[in-house]
């Protein structure tokens, strides 16, 4: 793999992972355009590293929340050991519970992960999925904004958002787009919908990386390419952080319409180019 390819894929991963335009779909398109599909597909180990790069971006952007949850996790263990029940439950502890429940639907989908991976080779599916993502974003802009935060959101709310995240395993369906849209439909405050979507991505990305790392070990890791891979990781982390900041700004304005139009254009273009090819 060349440095240029690593930079391009890192940039695509960092931007598309957090903006609601589907990183899996755009990576598949980029791989197709760069002619590195099929037998010479992007190495699993590089895929793992790219996702770790975007995970660094989430930690950098939401470190205060993550730190509070880590502290509250150990405080909660102490409360259990001493049979204490805080009333009310601290917001950070509620957030931990919401994230755990929101992650559960992914476990149901684990047996089908190879099926979803194969869908990434189908440009017709990806083009259609991008159009669907655009529709979801367009509709989410027209949903009445709720007021729920971690203090008032229910476990059922978190489960519904988690189902949206599980559906986004389909390449071309944006994970952030699905989770933010699901959050808006369940009555989340727009800023909290975005924050919860990113925090919910942490166990999802870690879990996916564990499974992909196993595949990488089975197929063999080319350690001589690691320096090139690390270039892509840095690009993914930096562009990912910038994307998070941009999406938070857009959330403050309450408009995702531009992303919807982009997804429609990208989806139609993908379908047209695939047909012509």
Language model: regions and residue ranges:
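Multi-pass membrane proteins that catalyze or facilitate reactions on polyprenyl-/lipid-phosphate substrates
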Residues: 1-277
């Amino acid at each position: 793999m060349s440095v240029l390819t690593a930079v391009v894929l890192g940039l695509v991963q960092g931007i598309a992972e957090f903006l609601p335009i589907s990183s899996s779909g755009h990576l598949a398109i980029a791989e197709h355009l760069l002619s590195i599909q099929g037998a010479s597909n992007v190495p699993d180990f590089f895929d793992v590293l790219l996702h770790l790069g975007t995970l660094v971006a989430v930690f950098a952007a939401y470190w205060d929340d993550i730190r509070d949850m880590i502290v509250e996790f150990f405080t909660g263990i102490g409360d259990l050991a001493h049979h204490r029940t805080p009333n009310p439950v601290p917001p950070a502890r509620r957030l931990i519970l919401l994230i755990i429940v929101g992650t559960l639907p992914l476990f149901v989908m684990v047996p089908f992960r190879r099926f979803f991976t194969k869908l990434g080779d189908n440009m017709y599916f990806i083009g259609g999925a991008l159009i669907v993502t655009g529709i979801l974003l367009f509709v989410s802009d027209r949903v009445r904004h709720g007021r729920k935060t971690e203090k008032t959101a229910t476990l059922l709310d978190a489960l519904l958002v988690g189902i949206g995240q599980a559906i986004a395993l389909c390449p071309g369906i944006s994970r952030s787009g699905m989770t933010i849209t699901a959050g808006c439909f369940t009555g989340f405050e727009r800023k909290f919908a975005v924050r919860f979507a990113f925090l919910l991505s942490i166990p999802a990305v870690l879990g996916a990386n564990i499974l992909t790392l196993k595949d990488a070990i089975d197929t063999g890791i080319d350690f001589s390419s690691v320096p090139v891979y690390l270039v892509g990781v840095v690009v993914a982390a930096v562009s990912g952080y910038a994307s998070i900041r941009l999406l938070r700004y857009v959330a403050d304005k309450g408009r995702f319409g531009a992303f919807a139009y982009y997804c429609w254009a990208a989806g139609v273009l993908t379908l047209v180019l695939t047909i012509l090819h």
